[in-house]
């Protein structure tokens, strides 16, 4: 399904938080949305792998990597695991690598930048905790919508049907 964050903001401005514009697209899917699962880690991607090995249908992985530009938290191998487990997308407040592989995958991926240096795999970090970056606090189970224009967050699912004439719009679960 395609999502348009500009249209969603026009309709739901009082219900959404807008993440500061700092992310670039790296995945093969231009827009994505889902209920978030958070991972907070710094230059270590073991918990990211563990989380991506779970069923990802209807989910977006939101990674707070502390904004580090020194090591990539996501690479082609981890993105392939995410794609295999049907994650909708991944947002990394940090870096990715192997960007040519990432852009060929059917998954949304946004991150600050790319760097060839990989992350450690010590398992240091936390899962499903509130995280804050980009002027927004992300809570586990919030709903994230992303496209090439930006990223927005809502506590409730937003209508997938942007026709204003509909009496009862279909909600995303």
UniProtKB/Swiss-Prot annotation:
InterPro entries: RraA, RraA/RraA-like, RraA/RraA-like_sf, RraA_gpbac. Belongs to the RraA family. Globally modulates RNA abundance by binding to RNase E (Rne) and regulating its endonucleolytic activity. Can modulate Rne action in a substrate-dependent manner by altering the composition of the degradosome. Modulates RNA-binding and helicase activities of the degradosome. The gene is rraA. The lineage of its organism: Bacteria, Pseudomonadati, Pseudomonadota, Gammaproteobacteria, Vibrionales. This is Regulator of ribonuclease activity A. GO terms for molecular function: endoribonuclease inhibitor activity; enzyme binding. The keyword Magnesium does not apply. Keywords: Cytoplasm. GO terms for cellular component: cytoplasm. It is found in: Cytoplasm. Transmembrane segments: none annotated. Homotrimer. Binds to both RNA-binding sites in the C-terminal region of Rne and to RhlB. Pfam families: RraA-like (PF03737). It comes from Vibrio vulnificus (strain CMCP6). GO terms for biological process: regulation of RNA metabolic process. Gene3D superfamilies: Ribonuclease E inhibitor RraA/RraA-like (3.50.30.40). Its main location: cytoplasm.
